[in-house]
């Protein structure tokens, strides 16, 4: 058997339950069924797709796991709004499967962070400014703990995302943030000046948000991400290497 034929032989068909789940998800994402609206009973879905009840149930279970549908008090199935982390982890998996590189991740993160800090500098509420202040204070107290600092870094940027008051930006930046967290932790462990530089950048970003200074915010967001890139390379990594499953496992574990 040739190598090509061997590869063909190993291809497996997509399970029917997955096709059912994908068909329902496409209808939801196209706006055909809106959040809170029913998707139909199991019996109706069996008739619609021409499959058996167990196949429909497996497809429903998959959508429930991803938070796309939920059972209401009357046991009817309705469209739900997936939590950001659930959407993010699915997109994160896709980035790994497509062998996205860290350079691509860095470039996308740069564009998103600049847009996010701009929104935060214009629209941050006093409540979120206070939350950012508490985050910076806690970071200053744990500089010797790389894991704690990396966790607070993730929280800091999540707060800036909320402060931007732009849900599209929040949804878009979550997947890359999940992958940046484990690399940040790695950098902070290997590059001794990493924690104090991170803290300085967070203080300056907070100051820009307080003063509603968009340009200062963009300047420090750019510096902060360039520090991440330099630290990543100094820790012995190549920006052009694909994101591997090790980072996926660590990032998903950190988000659970």
Name these PLM-found stretches.
Residues 27, 142, 161, 208-209:
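Hydrophobic side-chain positions on well-ordered alpha-helices
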Residues 129, 149, 217-218:
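Solenoid-repeat scaffolds in large eukaryotic assemblies
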Residues 1-118, 122, 239, 250-256:
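Short linear motifs at protein or domain termini
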Residues 122, 142-145, 210-211:
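Alpha-helix C-terminal capping/termination sites
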Residues 128-142:
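Amphipathic alpha-helical segments enriched in hydrophobic/aromatic residues interleaved with Lys/Arg
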Residues 42, 165-167, 212-214:
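Short loop-to-helix capping motifs
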Residues 136, 140, 157, 177-256:
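C-terminal all-alpha effector/ligand-binding and dimerization domain
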Residues 78, 87-88, 96, 108-127, ...:
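Hydrophobic, amphipathic alpha-helical faces that serve as interaction scaffolds
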């Amino acid at each position: 058997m040739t190598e090509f034929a061997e590869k063909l032989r190993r291809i497996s068909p997509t399970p029917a339950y997955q096709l059912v789940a994908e068909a329902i998800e496409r209808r939801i994402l196209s706006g055909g069924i809106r959040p809170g609206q029913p998707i139909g009973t199991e019996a109706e879905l069996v008739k619609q797709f021409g499959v058996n009840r167990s196949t429909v149930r497996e497809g429903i279970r998959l959508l429930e796991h991803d938070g796309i549908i939920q059972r209401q008090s009357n046991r009817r199935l309705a469209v739900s709004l997936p939590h950001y982390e659930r959407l993010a982890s699915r997109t994160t998996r896709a980035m790994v499967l497509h062998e996205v590189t860290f350079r691509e991740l860095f470039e996308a993160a740069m564009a998103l962070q600049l847009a996010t800090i701009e929104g935060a500098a214009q629209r941050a509420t006093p409540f979120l400014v206070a939350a950012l202040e508490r985050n910076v204070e806690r970071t200053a107290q744990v500089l010797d703990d790389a894991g704690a600092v990396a966790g607070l870094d993730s929280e800091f940027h999540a707060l800036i995302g909320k402060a931007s008051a732009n849900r599209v930006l929040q949804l878009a930046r979550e997947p890359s943030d999940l992958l940046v967290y484990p690399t940040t932790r790695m950098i902070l462990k290997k590059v001794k000046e990493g924690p104090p530089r991170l803290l300085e950048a967070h203080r300056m970003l907070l100051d820009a948000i307080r003063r509603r200074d968009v340009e200062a915010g963009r300047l420090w967001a750019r510096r902060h991400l360039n520090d991440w890139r330099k630290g990543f390379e100094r820790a012995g990594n190549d920006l052009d290497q694909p994101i591997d499953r090790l980072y996926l496992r660590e990032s998903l574990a950190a988000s659970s």
